[in-house]
């Protein structure tokens, strides 16, 4: 989502549209439902949505309750800081007085505690709130997956992604448990998008001009 306009847009949105056309025909349209880290799985399990294409990391715990596609994005946790920041990597945050901003319900919180245990983590309900806190000086860095931070940086001059990825957290498309045939169809469509160049075009569109972002690494899946 564009945190300035409130509009649902981004790499995942374009991927959802491209996948829908591959699976159901060029005239097919997708209905987009905005989710948060906390609501993704409940909405899926309650059949309010058919699939989650929303920066969802494939984890063993989640595999117990949902089915995942093949990885479609080489995500990893990174840092967003002002351009004039002296912070270069996650280890620079591992000292008393450092405050890191993150979103509740994401893997980011536990990872910061692991890699920078001396830092304090402030948790927010969504990425817009976390970035607002960064702008107002409530913390030295915001941390979550590289793709999300890249989107924020591209819309907000004066901020950059630093430190590379200090975790490996590939994104997958999730459907409800037991829908293995749907996953096969999604994987086939993903393979076709990669083969015809659509996937690489979307990577370049959304991440190609973001300072500090590893485009090649994101596309490795």
Identify the role of each PLM range.
Residues 30-42, 87-88, 122-132, 136, ...:
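Short helix-initiation/N-cap motifs at beta->coil->alpha
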Residues 26-28, 45-54, 97-99, 135-145, ...:
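Alpha-to-beta junction loops
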Residues 1-53, 196:
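Extracytoplasmic small-molecule ligand-binding "clamshell" domains
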């Amino acid at each position: 989502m564009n945190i300035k306009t409130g509009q649902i847009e981004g790499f995942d949105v374009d991927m959802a549209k491209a996948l829908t056309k591959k699976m159901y025909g060029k005239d097919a349209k997708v209905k987009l439902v905005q989710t948060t880290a906390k609501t993704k799985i409940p909405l899926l399990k309650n059949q309010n949505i058919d699939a989650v294409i929303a920066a969802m990391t494939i984890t063993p715990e989640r595999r117990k309750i949902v089915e995942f596609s093949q990885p479609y994005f080489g995500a990893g946790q990174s840092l967003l800081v002002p351009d004039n920041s002296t912070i270069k990597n996650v280890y620079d945050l591992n000292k008393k007085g450092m405050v890191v901003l993150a979103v509740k319900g994401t893997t980011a919180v536990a990872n910061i505690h692991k890699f920078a245990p001396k830092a304090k983590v402030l948790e927010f309900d969504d990425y817009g709130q976390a970035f607002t806190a960064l702008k107002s000086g409530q913390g030295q860095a915001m941390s979550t997956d590289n793709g999300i931070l890249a989107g924020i940086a591209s819309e907000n001059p004066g901020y950059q992604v630093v430190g590379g990825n200090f975790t490996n957290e590939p994104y997958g498309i999730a459907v409800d448990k037991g829908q293995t045939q749907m996953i096969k169809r999604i994987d086939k469509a993903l393979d076709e998008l990669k083969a015809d160049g659509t996937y690489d075009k979307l990577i370049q569109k959304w991440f190609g001009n973001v300072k500090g972002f590893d485009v090649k690494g994101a596309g490795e899946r």
